[in-house]
């Protein structure tokens, strides 16, 4: 609730704290009418302008136009017409520039006409200093966070009059807040011609303040206050917003710091950062472009690995052809399923392929070229015909007893050519599986020059020539209990298997033939191991 209070005393000692501000220029004053009672004359100041107005008491008389005359009582002069108020239709006249002396008494005369006839004459007298009330000036208020600014606007049409009159008036600003009223008195001089600002501080937060501005005349009854203008003072709203913004900034900064520290710890734990120098190169991310643009992995390096086969020397028994030594040293054959007997044969073998580089290491005493030395022998006839084995035999061997010898040929794998390249004194160890059902044994003649033709199931055209006992003694195959597997030749060098070879002869032929000297001559067909 806004309250207003009139100021009865004039002076700086009569300032009382008030919350409402009121600045009043004065109250309108109606001058007494000295003429007849046909009119009522009024003198007012509107925005520091002296305006004389009149009103007819008899409303039945309606003049069409008016003319204003005036004179000064102290000068005893005739009536003067006001140039701006001749034959005017309005009921007021501006005398700001005409009545300039505030110490003289002016006597105005208003004449009303209807066409050329006078209808009414009104007269009066006015003393400007006591009788001229001042209207309140225009003002604006602006609320800030810690104060309120009051901007008072003076509109002076006649600065000369104000310079003489305002020095007799005091300007007040009343401040209303609730039931309390506080009056402020700004310092105003008589030569004020411009606007001025007044600051009201030390305000209570969240309080509604209303301001009024007025001029206080000598007569307290003539105070004319301006309408109130109010504003709500809320300084804490901005402070609360600033505090909330500060708290929000602190929380945001804390969250960003926590996320950053957590990310760094996670990256360090999984090994993407803070890597040790001795880690593999695949874990070192020195180039950021590698992370963004993935590059193709480098090609794998191919290194040549040399595989060296070590041929260990096996113990070779001193084999002789005596009956006793042969019986003692002869290894008992190992029987396996399928009707096969496993014999351990020890000796130096040479491949039959002419393209194998291991032929260079074989001496002429131990092996001979089948294509160069062995003549083609015709197939035996009658009972001495050698049957062909049904299995895929890759070996050819010849068994001897007493004064006869057996020479075998071996197909080697080209990958083992380097291993077979050894000196003449090195010997290997070979293990064969022999199918006794496919072995053809025949009796050899006593003549040393006789020949035995051995037919291999895989190569029926290949023949073996008997050689002298003295020249082939070193290549005799000795039976042994242990053996090693020989490398095999390339399948491209093997002879094709004949499909039309009869298999019934091997079943009817006698596998063992007694030579009469205690030895049994066998024709052995060796099989390739996979």
UniProtKB/Swiss-Prot annotation:
Gene3D superfamilies: Immunoglobulins (2.60.40.10). Keywords: Cell membrane, Disulfide bond, Glycoprotein, Membrane, Phosphoprotein, Receptor, Repeat, Signal, Transmembrane, Transmembrane helix. It is a single-pass type I membrane protein. Residues 268-530 are cytoplasmic. GO terms for biological process: defense response to virus; response to interferon-alpha; response to interferon-beta; type I interferon-mediated signaling pathway. The modification Phosphoserine is found at residue 474. Pfam families: Interfer-bind, Tissue_fac. The chain crosses the membrane at residues 247-267. Glycans are attached at residues 58, 87, 101, 191. Residues 358-367 are annotated as: 2 X 5 AA tandem repeats of S-L-E-D-C. Heterodimer with IFNAR1; forming the receptor for type I interferon. Interacts with the transcriptional factors STAT1 and STAT2. Interacts with JAK1. Interacts with USP18; indirectly via STAT2, it negatively regulates the assembly of the ternary interferon-IFNAR1-IFNAR2 complex and therefore type I interferon signaling. Together with IFNAR1, forms the heterodimeric receptor for type I interferons (including interferons alpha, beta, epsilon, omega and kappa). Type I interferon binding activates the JAK-STAT signaling cascade, resulting in transcriptional activation or repression of interferon-regulated genes that encode the effectors of the interferon response. Mechanistically, type I interferon-binding brings the IFNAR1 and IFNAR2 subunits into close proximity with one another, driving their associated Janus kinases (JAKs) (TYK2 bound to IFNAR1 and JAK1 bound to IFNAR2) to cross-phosphorylate one another. This is Interferon alpha/beta receptor 2. It comes from Bos taurus. The gene is IFNAR2.
């Amino acid at each position: 609730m806004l309250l207003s209070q009139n100021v009865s005393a004039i002076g700086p000692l009569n300032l009382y704290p008030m919350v409402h501000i009121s600045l009043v220029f004065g109250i309108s004053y109606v001058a007494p009418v000295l003429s007849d009672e046909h009119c009522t004359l009024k003198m007012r100041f509107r925005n520091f302008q002296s305006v004389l107005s009149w009103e007819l008491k008899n409303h039945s008389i309606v003049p069409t136009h008016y003319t204003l005359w005036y004179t000064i009582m102290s000068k005893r002069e005739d009536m003067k017409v006001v140039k701006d108020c001749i034959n005017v239709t309005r009921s007021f006249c501006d005398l700001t520039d005409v009545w300039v002396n505030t110490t003289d008494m002016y006597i105005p005369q208003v004449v009303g006409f209807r066409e050329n006839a006078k209808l009414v004459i009104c007269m009066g007298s006015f003393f400007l200093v006591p009788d001229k009330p001042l209207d309140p000036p225009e003002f604006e208020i602006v609320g800030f966070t810690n104060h309120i600014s009051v901007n008072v606007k003076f509109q002076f049409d006649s600065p000369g009059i104000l310079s003489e009159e305002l020095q007799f008036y005091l300007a007040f600003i009343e401040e209303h807040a609730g039931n309390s009223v506080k009056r402020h008195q700004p310092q105003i001089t008589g030569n004020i011609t411009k606007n001025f600002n007044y600051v009201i501080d030390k305000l209570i937060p969240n309080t509604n303040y209303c301001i009024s501005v007025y001029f206080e005349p000598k007569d307290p009854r003539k105070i004319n206050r301006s309408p109130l203008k109010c504003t709500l003072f809320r300084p804490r709203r901005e402070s609360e917003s600033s505090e909330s913004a500060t708290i929000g900034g602190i929380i945001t900064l804390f969250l960003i710091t926590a996320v950053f520290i957590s990310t760094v710890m996670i990256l360090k734990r999984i090994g993407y950062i803070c890597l040790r120098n001795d880690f593999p190169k695949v874990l070192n991310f020195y180039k950021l472009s590698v992370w963004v643009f993935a590059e193709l992995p480098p090609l794998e390096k191919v290194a040549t690995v040399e595989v060296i086969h070590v041929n260990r020397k096996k113990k070779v028994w001193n084999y002789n052809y005596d009956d006793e030594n042969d019986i003692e040293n002869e290894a008992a054959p190992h029987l396996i399923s399928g009707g096969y007997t496993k014999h351990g044969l020890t000796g130096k073998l040479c491949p039959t392929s002419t393209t194998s580089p291991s032929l260079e290491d074989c001496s002429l005493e131990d092996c001979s070229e089948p294509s160069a030395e062995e003549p083609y022998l015709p197939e035996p006839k009658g009972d001495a015909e050698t049957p062909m084995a049904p299995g895929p035999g890759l070996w050819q061997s010849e068994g001897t007893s007493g004064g006869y010898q057996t020479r075998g040929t071996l197909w080697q794998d080209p990958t083992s050519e380097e291993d077979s390249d050894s000196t003449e004194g090195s010997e290997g160890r070979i293990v064969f599986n022999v199918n006794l059902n496919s072995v053809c044994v025949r009796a050899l003649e006593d003549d040393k020059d006789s020949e035995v033709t051995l037919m291999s199931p895989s190569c029926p055209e290949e023949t073996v020539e008997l050689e002298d006992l003295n020249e082939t003694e070193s290549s005799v195959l000795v039976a042994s209990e242990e053996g090693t597997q020989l490398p095999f030749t390339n399948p491209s060098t093997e002879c094709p298997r004949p499909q039309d070879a009869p298999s019934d002869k091997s079943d009817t032929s006698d596998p063992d033939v007694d030579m009469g000297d205690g030895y049994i001559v066998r024709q052995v067909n060796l099989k390739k191991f996979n």
